Design a protein with these regions (language model features):
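Core AdoMet radical
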Residues: 1-3, 18-33, 45-62, 72-97, ...
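Well-ordered, non-membrane alpha-helical segments in soluble/globular domains
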Residues: 2-11, 38-39, 63-66, 91-101, ...
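Acidic (Asp/Glu)-rich catalytic clusters
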Residues: 12-17, 41-46, 66-76, 98-107, ...
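Short, structured coil/loop segments at alpha-helix boundaries
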Residues: 34-35, 68-71, 150-155
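Conserved C-terminal portion of the radical SAM core fold
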Residues: 90-155
Length: 155
């Protein structure tokens, strides 16, 4: 990163921006891979902003670090957990994924679990719905991805 978490937080002071903002953090890949990300999140939360972090939910060490933030900050944090069901199942990471989702929920964060649908999941729909209901008490959301780099926003 070109700037420290503290510098970024200083630039994003809510007084400079006219009040608290909703800030979405989405990486070009897994958002939480950089080891510094929890500190960027922390510093922005300290400014009084609301953050939404898009993540695949698999980096337990990052969630462990974030879980140590004060609850009043965590209540301003929402995770959009991308639910890559087939890949998580193939790697045997479904338990890890749901454990991280529940950990953040128990610490006071808001969340969504969002399945990216594709034809290869048709036979698994009932299993996916039942798994989410069993683990989280509700079915996951469906998010249709679009290629924003194309004029027609292809699926």
């Amino acid at each position: 990163f070109l700037y420290t978490p503290e510098h970024v937080a200083n630039v994003f002071q809510k007084e400079r921006l006219g009040g608290p903002c909703i800030i979405n953090l989405t990486g070009g890949g897994e958002t939480l891979i950089p080891k510094e990300m929890p500190q960027y999140i922390y510093q922005l939360l300290l400014q009084g902003h609301f953050l939404e972090v898009v993540t695949n939910g698999t980096l337990t060490s990052r969630f462990d670090e974030i879980a140590e933030f004060p609850r009043n900050l965590l209540e301003h944090l929402e995770f959009k957990f991308s639910f890559h069901y087939a890949e998580l199942k193939k790697k045997g990471w479904l338990d890890r994924y749901f454990s991280n989702v529940k950990k953040m929920w128990e610490k006071g964060c808001s969340f969504t679990v969002e399945l990216m649908p594709y034809d290869g999941l048709i036979d698994d729909i009932n299993e996916i719905i039942n798994l989410c209901k069993s683990e989280l008490g509700a079915a996951c959301q469906i998010t249709v991805g679009r290629n924003d780099l194309t004029e027609k926003k292809d699926l």
